[in-house]
């Protein structure tokens, strides 16, 4: 069993030793017995007995070894983002490009369950193989990210908004990595809500440190922040799917009943929201713009 573990989760050259029905029989470098289903072969590849070919080796749920020529996005030596398929009591199940899903155990996920990833999120992981040949996803540690991120030593990205995913979530702040490899830290004072592990979020860059790590914020620039009346209107727009049947000609009584503000305050607030391109003012209604919706997506 220990010998099997040497090749599991990695790409190896295996010898084709036979064909049993629709299943090829392969032999590993240490004599391991490995099976290959024809559905896991490259379309343009014909295998010959006695020849060696490159395969990725993985265990099925009972620990039996299988091979595939469809190389996965990650191996036990390579980290990458993998899509979350679902979560359950055991943890998060991810797609790494194999015929079977891979589990990231619940013990490795945040203690606060609301910060667990949701289907469609992406976790930065590698593969881990235990002594029984069971395969799991392992989250990237801080030391791993230290060796793979792209450093930035200038202010060219300052005030730019980029997409990134948290690979580590702590009370003190959120640690994120972008598709371009930028490592970003968002201090707790620069967020109103904590993003989920693996959630795609928009983060505004506010600086960098000597290591080339970026500092970010989930908060808007000071001049873009909403006053109390504007926030009330914005929150109601979000609650009612981005549209409210009110505008600058609505009656003072209706405005007072719904928004608990005077008509003058309402007109000033929607005027401010309009100038910031957060809402559109139409005949008989106000609606959220694309920029308005993006404030929610970036947790502003």
Swiss-Prot record:
The keyword Chloroplast does not apply. Keywords: Virulence. It comes from Staphylococcus aureus (strain bovine RF122 / ET3-1). Gene3D superfamilies: Nucleic acid-binding proteins (2.40.50.140), Winged helix-like DNA-binding domain superfamily/Winged helix DNA-binding domain (1.10.10.10). PANTHER family: CONSERVED VIRULENCE FACTOR B (PTHR37296:SF1). This is Conserved virulence factor B. Belongs to the CvfB family. The keyword Aminoacyl-tRNA synthetase does not apply. Contributes to the expression of virulence factors and to pathogenicity. Involved in the production of hemolysin, DNase, protease and protein A. InterPro entries: CvfB_fam (IPR014464), CvfB_S1_2nd (IPR048588), CvfB_S1_3rd (IPR048587), CvfB_S1_st (IPR039566), CvfB_WH (IPR040764), NA-bd_OB-fold (IPR012340), WH-like_DNA-bd_sf (IPR036388).
């Amino acid at each position: 069993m220990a010998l099997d573990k040497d090749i599991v989760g990695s790409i190896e050259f295996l010898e084709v030793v036979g064909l049993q029905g629709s299943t090829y029989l392969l032999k590993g470098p240490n004599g391991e017995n490995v099976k290959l289903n024809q559905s896991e072969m490259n379309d343009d590849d014909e295998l010959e007995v006695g020849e060696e070919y490159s395969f990725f080796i993985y265990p099925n749920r009972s620990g039996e070894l299988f091979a595939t020529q469809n190389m996965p996005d990650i191996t036990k030596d390579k980290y990458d983002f993998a899509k979350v398929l679902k979560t359950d009591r055991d943890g998060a199940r991810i797609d790494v490009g194999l015929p079977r899903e891979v589990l990231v155990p619940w013990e490795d996920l945040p203690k606060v369950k609301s910060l667990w990833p949701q289907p469609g999120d992406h976790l930065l992981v590698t593969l881990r193989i235990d002594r029984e040949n069971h395969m799991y996803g392992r989250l990237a540690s801080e030391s791993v990210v230290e060796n793979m991120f792209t450093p930035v030593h200038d202010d060219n990205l300052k005030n730019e908004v980029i997409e990134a995913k948290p690979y580590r979530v702590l009370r003190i702040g959120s640690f994120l990595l972008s598709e371009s490899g930028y490592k970003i830290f968002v201090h707790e004072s620069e967020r109103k809500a904590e993003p989920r592990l693996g959630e795609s979020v928009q983060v505004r860059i506010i600086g960098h440190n000597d290591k080339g790590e970026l500092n970010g914020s989930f908060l808007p620039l000071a001049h873009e922040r909403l006053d109390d009346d504007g926030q009330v209107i914005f929150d109601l727009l979000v609650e009612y799917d981005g549209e409210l049947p009110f505008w600058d000609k609505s009656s003072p009584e209706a405005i007072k009943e719904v928004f608990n503000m005077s008509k003058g305050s309402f007109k000033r607030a929607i005027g401010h929201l309009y100038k910031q391109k957060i809402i559109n003012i139409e005949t008989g209604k106000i609606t959220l713009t694309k920029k308005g919706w993006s404030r929610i997506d970036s947790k502003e």
